Amino acid sequence: MQVLVRDNNVDQALRVLKKKMQREGVFREMKQRRSYEKPSERKTREKSEAIRRARKLARKQAIREGLLPAPPKKKLPERKPPLPQTAARPAG
């Protein structure tokens, strides 16, 4: 996996690399490979993941077709207005 470092900006390159690794599923695979997973456990996990994906897809399809209401959008907390600035005291 390659990431370009532009203008010696290593922080930005690291963020891009992390995002790429997340998309590829590298972190998930590393977590799974920490310990041995029996083939039967792997099969049940993969089956449950497939069921979860199918349910999610069906739910999105139903929302798109209007059979289910769309989930309510999360409300952002209201910002407080900034405090009024007081006049600077004269030195002396």
Curated annotation (Swiss-Prot):
Composition bias, Basic and acidic residues: 25-52
NCBIfam families: S21p
Region of interest (Disordered), ranges: 25-92
Any one GO MF annotation of this record: structural constituent of ribosome
Record's keyword terms, sorted: Ribonucleoprotein, Ribosomal protein
PANTHER family, sorted: MITOCHONDRIAL 28S RIBOSOMAL PROTEIN S21, SMALL RIBOSOMAL SUBUNIT PROTEIN BS21M
GO biological process: translation
Classification via Pfam families: Ribosomal_S21
Name used for this protein in its record: Small ribosomal subunit protein bS21A
A GO CC annotation given for this chain: ribosome
